[in-house]
Regions:
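Conserved nucleic-acid-binding Ia/Ib motif block in the N-terminal RecA-like helicase ATPase lobe
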Residues: 1
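Peripheral, non-AAA+ core regions of ATP-driven protein-machinery
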Residues: 4-18, 24-308
Length: 308
């Protein structure tokens, strides 16, 4: 049904405990001016449905369209009318789908639910780490695992790097390539510059490719140290310890800065069997079963893993 009166009549007949409207922009009412999906229609229809839900103790889920930038399409007022706003997110090149709480009057708004897009449909993911890491039989140069936070949920992600000499023509003109996938390109370029100037790992005049495994998108600075270590490992052709995770923001002076949720991240790494964790100095992390390596500077981090 797409007419409000018919929807209400059906509610009266069925007396549901759960009501899902998909989507609110397609419902219309002859008693309200304007076209379906317009400001007046959406406001009045949503208000009427919310009123009925509260009067009859019905759990109401309103599905709304979103724009290309991910915001709720149509009138923004729809977000203000409801108690909880959940965004269903995902990249078409990745199997991971997220339900992220944007607004929550009854709890935390930084909670995230993880789901896997499979051939048989969407299934819940209790441990999404397997999508974004690879267990290598032998240590491989250019790989490093980090721990990122999706809301308050720690997820381990593998960063892979490849450093190679460009062709002769590119070398003559200094047109070395910098290609990233799943990472913030300007931030990665900054990390490469710091790696060369502060840790003496030469990457200028060489092609550098850095990517996340499984299509994971990482934008937080906490992955800087893992990016630097993976590139340094690839540049030197020396593998990092397979049981190592690295977290920390890299500053322009080469310092390793503290990050939020460090204890929670390392606890997740320990739970999944990692034995060493490289973290910013002063993080004061104590987790049973994992050795914590504190580093204050990038060159110190490079020395600890012996790729200098």
């Amino acid at each position: 049904e797409s007419e409000l009166g018919a929807v209400i009549a059906h509610i009266d007949s069925v007396k549901p405990q759960l009501l899902i409207i998909d989507s609110i922009q397609t419902i219309s009412s002859g008693a309200v001016d304007g076209a379906p999906g317009g400001i007046t229609q959406v406001r009045e229809i949503a208000a009427a449905l919310i009123r009925i839900a509260k009067e009859r103790a019905i759990t109401l889920i309103l599905v709304g369209h979103v724009t290309k930038d991910g915001t709720v399409a149509g009138p923004k007022l729809l977000e203000h009318l409801v108690d909880v706003v959940l965004n269903f997110e995902g990249d078409r090149h990745s199997r991971l789908r997220l339900i992220r709480a944007i607004k929550n009057r009854f709890g935390a708004s930084d909670e995230v639910g993880c789901f896997d897009m499979t051939e048989s449909g969407i299934t819940s993911l209790t441990d999404p780490t397997g999508l974004f890491t690879t267990r290598h039989s032998d240590p491989v140069p250019g790989t490093c695992v980090t721990v990122t936070l999706e809301g308050r949920r720690p997820i381990l992600a593998e960063i892979q790097a490849l450093v190679s000499a460009p062709n002769a023509q590119d070398r003559d003109y200094g047109n070395s390539r910098r290609v990233t996938s799943g990472l913030d390109n300007p931030r990665t370029a900054m990390t490469l510059a710091v790696l060369e100037l502060r840790a003496n790992i030469r990457v200028s005049g060489r092609d550098v490719y850095v990517a996340t495994v499984g299509g994971m998108k990482i934008s937080e600075p906490a992955a800087d140290l893992a990016v630097a270590l993976s590139v340094g490992s690839a540049a030197k052709g020396l593998a990092l310890p397979a049981d190592l995770v690295a977290i920390g923001e890299v500053g322009l002076a080469g310092e390793i800065r503290k990050i939020t949720g460090a204890q929670q991240r390392i606890q997740e790494a320990a739970r999944l069997g990692f034995k060493k964790a490289m973290v910013p100095a002063g993080s004061d992390i104590k987790v049973e079963g994992i050795e914590v390596l504190e580093v204050a500077r990038l060159d110190q981090a490079i020395s600890k893993v012996r790729i200098n």
